[in-house]
C-alpha cells in the first residue's frame, strides 16, 4: 500500500479488477428483487460534459447501494446517435455523419469507463445501427396495419434557396440558418402517429407515477384536455349556407365577440383572397413565418380585414372576419372568436387595429377600463356575466351551460371535449435517421416494405451538402422494385423523427440480442424502477416514450403500460461567466479557467481580469454550463488532475440531485483533500486495521462504546438518506464518520477496524475506486468478499444505547451547564442530582430551590 493517495494508480487497479471479473455483466435472477435504473442515453456530441457526469454518477451511486442491499441491479448505456447535429458536423468537416458519430461514441465511451461506472457494456446499443432501427421500422409497419400510423399533408418550413425542409430551430428571425433566405411554409405529405388516440390514458396514468409534480403538470398542460363549446358563425358565400366553426372554453363571453380571426391556410381565407391582392400578399407573408407554436406565441400579432362578415349565432349581428398570423390551422378549427374585452391577446389585437371592445364579464369590487389590460378581465373564477342579455348575473359554469344549450337549440353547436395534443408527425426530410419503410410504386401507390426485407438499411457513406436530402440523390438507395407488382419503384426518402429512437431503447437494453423486438427478459426488467434525466425532456421524450410503450403493450409485445415507475430530474450544473462586449454589442465569452477573480473581505467577487492580457472582463453571473457561454468544465481535465472519485464526490456533495449545482474549484479541492484523509488514515493505521481481532461489545471501554455509538448513529441517517436519494447528506455523514474515527482516543484496533469498514461501505457507492482498493488492501475482502457485493452494514442497535444521558441544566431559565444522569433515573433522582450540581451552587446565590421543572430526556430548570 502506497503512503500517498495516487488516484490514477488506484483507479486503474480497481477498474482492472472489475474488468477481469466482468463485474457489471447482469443476468435475470428471480431469486432477488430487481432494480433497473437508466440514465437518459446521451447524444454522441464528442465529449462528456459535467451534466453527463452528474447524471451518470447519480445512477451509479444508486446501482451500487442497492446491489450491496441484495438487489439484482442493472445499469446499461447506449447512444442516441441519429439527428441533425451529425449532419451539420458532416457538412462542416466533409465526412459522413456515420464516421463522426462512431468516432465520438468511441471517445465518450472511454470517458465513461474512466469514471468507473457500473455499466453492463454487453447491452450497449447505438440507435444508428441497423439491428436497432430495424425494430423502429417493424413497429411503424405494425402501427400502419392498425391505423395508428397514417399519412396526410403537413406544414413544414421550406428554404427556397437550399431547397430543403428546415427544423423549427433552423429558422432564425424567419430566415434559413444557412442561406439567409426567407423561409416559406409548405404543405407536404407526411406520416403521423395517432398519439391523440391515447390522450385520455396518457393523462389519467400520470396519477400513478412517482414523477416530480412539475413534470406531471407540464405533461397535463401539453395534453391539454379542455371542456368547452364547438360552434359556428353562420354565413352565406357562393350561394351556400355555411358555418365558420370555432372552439372556445369561454362560451360565457360569447356576447363580447367583436371579430373572428382565421388562419392564413383556412379555406375561407383562400376563397376570400381570390380577388384581393392585399389578402394574398398577407397570406404569403404568414407562410414565411415559423410553423412552431412557440414561434407564433412570441411573434408580433398581425392581421388584415377581409371585408367579409359572418353572423353572431345568438344575436344575428354581423361579425367582421380577419386573417391573423397568430391563428394556426393545425390547432382547433383554424379559426377563433375574438373577445378583446376578456382575452389578453385579442385585447392587444383590437387596440392595434381599433376594433370594438365590449365588457361582458364583471368581478365584484373591480372597475373595467379600456385603457389597459388587467388580469381579472380573463379570470373565469370570479366572472359574472354583464351586458349579456338573458345571461346577465350567471357565473362561469352556469353561463357556459346556458349558452351551449341555446347554440345546440339553434343548430350551431354543442359542448365538446378537445385536446391540445396533436398527432405526432414523424416524417423528417433529413438523411441521418431511420428510413421510413415505404416504397412508392407508380402502379400500386405506397407499399410497405415486407417484413422479411427489414431493415431498410441507411447508407453510411453519404456526405450532406445542405442542398436537399442526400437520400433523394442516391441511386443505390432510391431505386428498388415494388414488392407487389415487381415494377421499378422508388424508396421513401424521409426518415423518422429521432424521438422515435429514444422512445423504447430502455426496453431493448433488456434484450439486446433478441431476434424479436423484445422478449421475456423485457418483462423481467421493465418498467424501469428509476429513470434519470433533465427537466428539458419533460414533455416530448417522456410523453412519446409513454405513448410508444402503450402501443407496444396493445400489440402484445410487453405486459406493462408505463416505461418508468420513478423519475428523477437532476438539476443543471452552473458556473460563473465572464465576457467582453465590443462596440457593436457582440459579446465574447471567456472560460473561468482563463480568468483571475478578485474578492472583497467577505469573499464576494468584485472584479475579474483575463489572464492573457491582464485587462478587465465583465462578471456575467452564474449560468448553466454551455458552449455558448464558454463556462464549461472539461470532465476529462478534472479526472486527469484529481481522479474520477474526486469528480464523483464533488458532484454528489455540492447539492441534492434534483437541485442546481454551482461549480466550485475550492469544492473540488476539498473533495480531493477528504479522499486523501480517508487514504491517509487507512495507511497510517494499516496494521491495526488489517488485524482481524474480535471483541465482546459488552466489555468494551468507554472510548470504544462512544465511537461505535457515533458511527452507528450516523450510519442510520446515511442509510435513510441513500433511500431518499439525498446523496449530499450521505457524503456529510461519511465526513462525520471519518472525523469520529480519526479523533477517537483510546479506541481499540478491533473497533477501529469495524468502524472504518462501515465508513468504506458508506462511501463506496459514491467513490468506488478508493474504497474498493482500501477494502481489498486492508483485508476486508478476505473476510466479507469484494466490496462490489459486500453486505451493506447493519446498524447495531445495542451500540446506540446509552447508560447515561445528558440533560441541559438551567437556573431561572438560563442555561448554566449539563447534567449527566442514568438513562432510567427517576424524577426524584434527577432533581437531587440537579441541586447537588456545582452549577446550581454557583448561580443560585445561596438561595434554595423554589421549584424544579424536569422535561424528560431534555432539561432540568431550577427556579430560585
UniProtKB/Swiss-Prot annotation:
Taxonomic lineage from the root: Bacteria, Pseudomonadati, Pseudomonadota, Betaproteobacteria, Burkholderiales
Principal localisation: cytoplasm
Name of the coding gene: leuS
A biological process term (GO) from this entry: leucyl-tRNA aminoacylation
UniProt source species: Burkholderia orbicola (strain MC0-3)
Top-level EC class: ligase
Domain of life: Bacteria
Binding, ATP: 627
Family per record: Belongs to the class-I aminoacyl-tRNA synthetase family.
Protein name in UniProt: Leucine--tRNA ligase
Pfam families the record matches: Anticodon_1, tRNA-synt_1, tRNA-synt_1_2, tRNA-synt_1g
EC numbers for this chain: 6.1.1.4
Location relative to the cell: Cytoplasm
